[in-house]
Every structure is written in C-alpha cells, then in structure tokens.
Amino acid sequence: MTVLPALPPLDDLETLNVHLETLSAENRVCWALERGPDHPALSSSFGAQSAVMLHLLTRFAPDIPVILVDTGYLFPETYRFADTLTERLKLNLKVYQPLRSGAWTEARHGRLWEQGIDGINQYNTLHKVEPMRRALEELQVGTWFTGLRRGQSSTRTQTSIVQQRDERYKISPIADWTDRDIWEYMKHHDLPYHPLWEQGYVSIGDIHTTRPLEPGMREEDTRFFGFKRECGIHENI
C-alpha cells in the first residue's frame, strides 16, 4: 500500500501543486484517488500515447470509467486501437457520441471543419465539448484524470497537476513528463503506440483535421490545419 506524505488541502491549490511536483506520477494518482472528490474518471482520445495513462490509472483503479468521445470521424485505426486496449487492460469504457450524427450535422451546416476557425470551433463544440460535458455530468465525475503534458504544445506549457473547475477537480499526473519519459514507461510495460504513430502521426484526432508531422512543422500544426491545437475540451470544461 502506498504511504502518501501529508499534503496541503484541496482548497490551497497553489501550495498543493508545488508539493505534487515533487511526487511521482504514481503517487499523484494515489493521492487524487484517496483525497479527491468521489466518482473519478479518466478521459482518453485513444491517441498516439494514450496507453500510458490508461495503464497508469488502471493499476490503481481497475474499474475507473474511461470516457471516449466518439465524434463519428475517428480513424479506423483508432477504433481498433480502442478495442485492443480495452481488451488488454480490461477497461471500463464509456463511449459518448454527439447528439446528432455527422451526416445530420453536415446536412444542416455543411462540412464545418472546412469553414475556417469559426466552423472548426462550432464543429468541436457539437462533436467533442458537448459529449464530454454530458459524460462528466452523467457519471457525476468529481475527479477527472487527463493525460495533458506541458511539452505537447504551447497551449499546455502552464498545465498544473491539479486544477479546479467549479466543483470538479482536473488531475494531470504526467503533466511534467517528457516524450522520453513516455517512451521509457511504454517500453518498461510493453505498451503499444497508436498504429498511426509509425506513419508520422504524433497527435491523432479526427480523420479530416489530423495530418502527419512533416519537416518544418510543429506538433501542434498537425491538428486543425494549423489554426489551433486544442479541440475545446480542455479550454472550455
């Protein structure tokens, strides 16, 4: 059993984050499961390096709900990867989808992702943000685990290990991990990268707004035609 050090209370987030920076990712997870609000859950895109957080969380909470937002436009490889990891890690997978199908949305609005930044934002709200917000509410999630890392993009450099959003706490236990840390964890535990990783895809979302990394590109340029990096979930929830 992991013995956790005495840490500041949740209502002193600034001091708490300073202390959490000194702990391992494993101890951060244990702390959040023990001291955080009820009904923890993990969100996962089943993207390039998603196996790390899925493995890390289920080591300590085997039955934790794993939320996947299925936009209807994921890569076929992503659906198969989700099946593979769900079977291997015995995941308690909870799939949430938009209130309207992609075909219905296209009939109403056209291909929103081809309509500039405003269209992309509207698409993300309908197909990503709303389903995730609904999942968190229906599952009554008090402690929300994410795989956000500071090194992923310029929009994530200030990611705290714990944040408060209304009455919910958002926990990013590998916020300070580097790509090397990810690789070492995956190698040690024999975890797979997403099948598209070997084809140059370093950040994997929807099939129509994801590109492989090419010379001269930043990782964040591979999403949403370079307009933005975030899909809205971690900006708006």
Swiss-Prot record:
What are the GO cellular component annotations?
cytoplasm
Could you give a GO molecular-function term held by this entry? phosphoadenylyl-sulfate reductase (thioredoxin) activity
Q: In which pathway does it act?
A: Sulfur metabolism; hydrogen sulfide biosynthesis; sulfite from sulfate: step 3/3
Q: Which UniProt keywords apply?
A: Cytoplasm, Oxidoreductase
What EC number(s) does this enzyme carry? Answer: 1.8.4.8
Q: Where does the record say this protein resides? A: Cytoplasm
Q: What family is reported?
A: Belongs to the PAPS reductase family. CysH subfamily.
* Protein function: Catalyzes the formation of sulfite from phosphoadenosine 5'-phosphosulfate (PAPS) using thioredoxin as an electron donor.
This protein is called Phosphoadenosine 5'-phosphosulfate reductase
Its source organism is: Xylella fastidiosa (strain 9a5c)
